[in-house]
Amino acid sequence: MESHPHNKTDQTQHIILVHGPIIIGAGPSGLATSACLSSRGVPSLILERSDSIASLWKSKTYDRLRLHLPKHFCRLPLLDFPEYYPKYPSKNEFLAYLESYASHFRIAPRFNKNVQNAAYDSSSGFWRVKTHDNTEYLSKWLIVATGENADPYFPEIPGRKKFSGGKIVHASEYKSGEEFRRQKVLVVGCGNSGMEISLDLVRHNASPHLVVRNTVHVLPREILGVSTFGVGMTLLKCLPLRLVDKFLLLMANLSFGNTDRLGLRRPKTGPLELKNVTGKSPVLDVGAMSLIRSGMIQIMEGVKEITKKGAKFMDGQEKDFDSIIFATGYKSNVPTWLQGGDFFTDDGMPKTPFPNGWRGGKGLYTVGFTRRGLLGTASDAVKIAGEIGDQWRDEIKGSTRNMCSSRFVFTSKS
């Protein structure tokens, strides 16, 4: 086996032959897949670019965050949440669960391993994964667990660099409304994050203006004390999807009235059908709707342009703001490092639609790209572990026990 260092100033390149799959990402997706593989007797190696597990949850989320779904819909495979956890665990409780999950399954990711590129080598039948520290990892299997929310997404809005007021940040940098106290804040994006950040701003005596560019479904988080999501999942077992959607919209109308009057136009497609077709989730209200009705959260149309002091809007209005927060979601970063192949789109999502997007070719797998949250992650992890577990067992039966963990250090002669 030969090695050709990319960095000629560093004369040594490490090549590591991995005993089992390489998993990229130590978030919930990577942890769940590693645990499921372990339960099938398959070892794995997780490479994580940050210095901890679940770095997105740990450092890129706001303080008041709680799971929007009940905990039994958010558990990872093979380990329940502690019984004493509340129905909707907090961010810190979820992080503690993930830490205990990693400890329980003895998952030890290699941290601060930023993958520069990964490509399949047809001559050897191995995936070659190169990290920033001049190390190359080789395996027959590559599992992409970086997910659909790897990097912050900013929409293309003219003038963003012109703004000279206060802060202009992505929601991933937002922690609490305390730093925006008494400010007039523009919140761009009306998903769950945008709604909840606006709620938090009001509670810290700020004045949020929430941009709603497109149609959006807003549902109550609970119906008569029962999770709306849970009600929907139960009804789908015996009723057609469109009937379930009609029921959910009836409950929403009873809770909020006609949201069009508030500037929140509903899509023509029902919430569950829209989720299945586009992956766009409905907003589950945790208190923002009452503040919108009272006028404490003001709804604005789409932003046409960011100005030096604020923004111009599609309806012709122009307003000044002290700060701007982009609650515009995240994007996959797969295209920046995965080389070759046509399994992913240019946006970094599997071309094969749910529920079959977890399997690529030549030992490539993906987990966390279903647009179905932690439920989708758990489903992917179980399927991947099942398929690789079968391949692993067949290899053992075929006397391939000599594929053991090996470490080689090559020194360039150039």
Curated annotation (Swiss-Prot):
Its recorded name reads: Probable indole-3-pyruvate monooxygenase YUCCA1
Its catalytic activity?
Answer: indole-3-pyruvate + NADPH + O2 + H(+) = (indol-3-yl)acetate + CO2 + NADP(+) + H2O
Q: What does this protein do?
A: Involved in auxin biosynthesis, but not in the tryptamine or the CYP79B2/B3 branches. Catalyzes in vitro the N-oxidation of tryptamine to form N-hydroxyl tryptamine. Involved during embryogenesis and seedling development. Required for the formation of floral organs and vascular tissues. Belongs to the set of redundant YUCCA genes probably responsible for auxin biosynthesis in shoots.
Which pathway does this polypeptide act in? Plant hormone metabolism; auxin biosynthesis
Q: Identify the residues that bind NADP(+).
A: G189, C190, G191, N192, S193, G194
| Example of a GO biological process term | auxin biosynthetic process
Q: Which family does it belong to?
A: Belongs to the FMO family.
Q: Organism, per UniProt?
A: Arabidopsis thaliana (Mouse-ear cress)
One Pfam family this sequence matches: FMO-like
EC number(s) per entry: 1.14.13.168
Q: Which InterPro entries match?
A: Auxin_biosynth/cation_transpt, FAD/NAD-bd_sf, Flavin_mOase-like
Q: Does the keyword Flavoprotein apply?
A: yes
Known SUPFAM superfamilies for this protein? FAD/NAD(P)-binding domain (SSF51905)
Q: In which tissues is it expressed?
A: Expressed in the apical meristems and young floral primordia. Detected in the floral meristems and at the base of the floral organs.
Residues given in the record as FAD binding sites: G25, A26, G27, P28, S29, G30
The enzyme's first-digit EC class, named in words, is oxidoreductase
What is an example of a GO molecular function annotated in this UniProt entry? N,N-dimethylaniline monooxygenase activity
